[in-house]
Amino acid sequence: VVETPRRSMNKLINSNDSVKRTIDEAFMIRAIKMHLAPAVKEEHLAEIVKNATLEKFDANQELFKEGDQGDSLYLIRSGSVTVSKSIGEKNTTLAYLPAGNYVGEMALMTDMPRSATVKAAVSTETIVLKGEDFRGLLSKNPDTRHQLELLIAQRLEQNKEKKSGHGEGLV
C-alpha cells in the first residue's frame, strides 16, 4: 500500500486524461461491485465500465423526470438526490438518497416510463450506466437481477402506499 497526499493525487489525476480515465474506471468498478452487483466478477464489470460515463449535476438540476423513457441507471458517486412524484396536484418528496445509492433501475427493468423525478439536492456526480449495458449485466447475472426485482417490488409497494396516503415509503 502506498500513501499519497490528496493534493498530489488530484494533481496526478487531472494531469493526463488516460490516467484520469483509468482511475475513474477503477472507482466505477469498485462502486458498482459494492453497491449494485456484489456477486459479479470485476472482469465482467470492466466491460460495462468502458461505456459508463461520469456526469455532474448542479443543485436542483434534474437527472430525469417522471414520465421520461428510461435509458440509463445513475449510481451516485458524490452528493445526494431527492426523489419526488406527482401525487394528485402535489409534488411529494419520497426519498433523499446520498452517495452510494442508485436510481433509474426501475424504468430499465420494467420498460415503463420513469416513475419519479430525481433531482440533485446538492452538487452531485454520478456514474451513468447505459440501459443496454445494465440489461446485459443482469442477463449474465440472474442473482443480481433477482435481488433488484425484489427491491423494485418493495419500492412499487411503498409508492402505492405513499400515493394512497398510508405510508412513508422510499423510492
Q: Which residues make up each language-model segment?
A:
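Cytosolic regulatory regions built on CNB/CRP/Popeye-like sensor folds
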Residues: 1-171
